[in-house]
Regions:
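Enzymes that bind and transform nitrogen-containing heteroaromatic metabolites
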Residues: 1-190
Length: 190
């Protein structure tokens, strides 16, 4: 069965964005882009909340065409345009979307159907509200976290309204030159 992997940049104190959604504190660079690029190339499905999906759609489809496109822009744009996208939204309609499916109801059933389909693991990109919903229904299988060397003090938390303990098994860690630490956790359902 396919796994849902939550891919998220977080602050040391567990926030994924500032109080107004700002993400200008996230550290990136070629080292992280290359590492992430290799891993996402192994996936064939991306999962987004509506807000993150719309943000991605505003940039990635044509990012490679810009005269100032970086290596990362070109590679990620190519991946984004070929990957199958699933969007969690109660307000969007999928009538004219290409290579994209909208899940608007029966979240647990629809996600479990998706996980049963043939294919590679499914990456949930950012999307804090969608992540909260999936966590609350015990649908996330792994956490791929990039802990940034900053304490925000307030903002949008990664973990919100958790009803019980979620046991995790640490799979790997990696430290990047910019100070970011990658943590890979598997949800331990035993």
């Amino acid at each position: 069965m396919r796994k849902i992997i939550s891919f998220m940049h977080i602050s040391l104190d567990g926030f994924v964005a500032g109080p107004n959604g700002e993400m200008n504190w996230i550290k990136t660079g070629e080292e992280i882009f290359d590492h992430v690029g290799k891993r996402i190339d192994e996936t064939d499905t991306a999962l987004y909340g509506r807000v993150t999906y719309q943000m991605m759609e505003d940039y990635w489809p044509t990012a490679a065409d810009k005269p100032t496109a970086t290596k990362h822009d070109i590679e990620h744009s190519k991946w984004y345009n070929k990957v199958y996208k699933v969007v969690l939204s109660k307000s969007m309609k999928d009538t004219s979307l290409t290579n994209t499916k909208i899940i608007s109801d029966n979240l647990s059933d629809r996600i479990n159907e998706l996980k049963q389909q043939a294919g590679e693991d499914i990456l949930l990109f950012g999307s804090p509200r969608a992540t909260h919903s999936l966590i609350q229904q015990n649908l996330i299988d792994c956490y791929w976290l990039f802990v940034n060397p900053i304490i925000l003090g307030q903002g949008i938390p990664l973990f919100e309204d958790i009803k019980g303990k979620i046991k995790l098994k640490l799979l790997t860690t990696r430290h990047f030159n910019c100070g970011v630490t990658e943590l890979n956790y598997l949800v331990d359902r035993q």
